[in-house]
């Protein structure tokens, strides 16, 4: 299979491992070649019948959303992370905006977002983002970002600027943020977020602690739980949320234990979906979880006291996020 690059969009060029340039965005093999954990290509498991991806139909809002994003120099995690639900979500006029650029300072080998030395923050981004959301008349948005370990606050102030500007230009819009872990700067980041807390606070644990070194190099399971718990302590009325992906080698009991940890740290909502390998250079899928197993996790989530659980093969962190938030009392 060959891949054609669009010369009109140089930001999507992929640097080769042999000619490493930290200012260029590395994806796929160029990205994973330099992580401490070696990704060994494996024979791909055959996708089962319950894995279905909906393509956007010509004439849907899919193309309108993409055009508006390009006009305002904005990125979505839907595109950058190759989300399988992009057709459905763009088609109905929803998107998860990715701020602070499209180059992440981490190299997680499950993720399709590019790695590289990030560009300076765009001072116009909060304004451009807010104007776009107002123009699209969106009632609910999710704002996420790449990891910005190069910034003293991890990007917390930029999140607050975006939240503030959105509320100024589109007061009807409810805002969920999906934040990085702010590792090494958590206290500073939480203090800054106090100035403009979101309507929903989301931070994904992604996988079980045993697999962190392999799947999330540079991250720490207990630190991520601490982030969620400390934010909740500061803002008890703001729902908190976290997500997991299945298929990296975890066991069902390990997933249930992580769910218990989430509840012990006052996480209100949970998403659980199937990991899909973006390329042969990313971590392989070691199992496709059967719908009956997803149904079991959903039952267990409600039994544990989660206010809402979105669980299924194609579920992603911000999939139907507006419906999840409404179920948790965000109006």
Swiss-Prot record:
Cofactor: [4Fe-4S] cluster
Keyword Transcription: no
EC number(s) per entry: 2.8.1.8
PANTHER family linked to this entry: LIPOYL SYNTHASE (PTHR10949), LIPOYL SYNTHASE, MITOCHONDRIAL (PTHR10949:SF0)
Family as reported in the entry's similarity comment: Belongs to the radical SAM superfamily. Lipoyl synthase family.
Pathway given in the UniProt record: Protein modification; protein lipoylation via endogenous pathway; protein N(6)-(lipoyl)lysine from octanoyl-[acyl-carrier-protein]: step 2/2
Tagged with keyword Chaperone: no
PROSITE patterns: RADICAL_SAM
Cofactor: how and how many bound: Binds 2 [4Fe-4S] clusters per subunit. One cluster is coordinated with 3 cysteines and an exchangeable S-adenosyl-L-methionine.
Compositional bias annotation for Polar residues: 1-14
Subcellular location: Cytoplasm
Name this polypeptide is given: Lipoyl synthase
Keywords: 4Fe-4S, Cytoplasm, Iron, Iron-sulfur, Metal-binding, S-adenosyl-L-methionine, Transferase
NCBIfam families hit by this protein: lipA, PRK05481.1, PRK12928.1
GO MF terms held by the record: 4 iron, 4 sulfur cluster binding; lipoate synthase activity; metal ion binding
Binding positions for [4Fe-4S] cluster 2 per the UniProt entry: 104, 108, 111
Record-level GO cellular component terms: cytoplasm
Domain Radical SAM core: 89-307
Catalytic activity: [[Fe-S] cluster scaffold protein carrying a second [4Fe-4S](2+) cluster] + N(6)-octanoyl-L-lysyl-[protein] + 2 oxidized [2Fe-2S]-[ferredoxin] + 2 S-adenosyl-L-methionine + 4 H(+) = [[Fe-S] cluster scaffold protein] + N(6)-[(R)-dihydrolipoyl]-L-lysyl-[protein] + 4 Fe(3+) + 2 hydrogen sulfide + 2 5'-deoxyadenosine + 2 L-methionine + 2 reduced [2Fe-2S]-[ferredoxin]
Chain intervals for the UniProt region annotation (Disordered): 1-32
Residues involved in [4Fe-4S] cluster 1 binding: 78, 83, 89, 318
Entries under InterPro entries matching the protein: Aldolase_TIM, Elp3/MiaA/NifB-like_rSAM, LIAS_N, Lipoyl_synth, rSAM
């Amino acid at each position: 299979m060959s891949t054609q690059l669009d010369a009109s969009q140089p930001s999507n060029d992929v640097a080769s491992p042999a000619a490493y340039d930290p200012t260029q965005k590395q994806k796929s093999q160029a990205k994973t070649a330099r992580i401490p954990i070696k990704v060994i290509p494996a024979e791909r498991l055959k996708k089962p019948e319950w894995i279905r991806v909906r393509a956007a139909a010509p004439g849907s809002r899919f193309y309108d959303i993409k055009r508006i994003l390009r006009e305002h120099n904005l990125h979505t995690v839907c595109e950058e992370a190759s989300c399988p639900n992009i057709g459905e979500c763009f088609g109905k006029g929803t998107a998860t905006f990715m701020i602070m650029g499209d180059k992440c300072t981490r190299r997680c080998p499950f993720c399709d977002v590019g790695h590289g030395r990030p560009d300076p923050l765009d001072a116009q981004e909060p304004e451009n983002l807010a104007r776009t959301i107002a123009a699209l008349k969106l009632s609910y948005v999710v704002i996420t970002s790449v990891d910005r370990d190069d910034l003293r606050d991890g990007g917390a102030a930029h999140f607050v600027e975006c939240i503030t500007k959105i509320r100024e230009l589109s007061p009807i819009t409810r805002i969920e943020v999906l934040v990085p872990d702010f590792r090494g700067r958590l206290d500073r980041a939480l203090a800054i977020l106090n100035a403009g807390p979101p309507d929903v606070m989301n931070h994904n644990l992604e996988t079980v602690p045993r697999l962190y070194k392999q799947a999330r190099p540079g991250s720490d399971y207990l630190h991520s739980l601490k982030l969620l718990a400390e934010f909740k302590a500061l803002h008890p009325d703001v729902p908190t949320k976290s997500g997991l992906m299945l298929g990296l080698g975890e066991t069902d009991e390990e997933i249930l234990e992580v769910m218990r940890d989430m509840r012990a740290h006052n996480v209100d909502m949970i998403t659980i979906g199937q990991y899909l390998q973006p390329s042969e250079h990313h971590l392989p899928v070691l199992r496709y979880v059967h719908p009956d197993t997803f149904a079991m996790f959903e039952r267990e989530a409600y039994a544990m006291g989660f206010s809402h659980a979105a669980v299924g093969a194609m579920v992603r962190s911000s999939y139907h996020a507006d419906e999840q938030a409404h179920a948790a009392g965000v109006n």
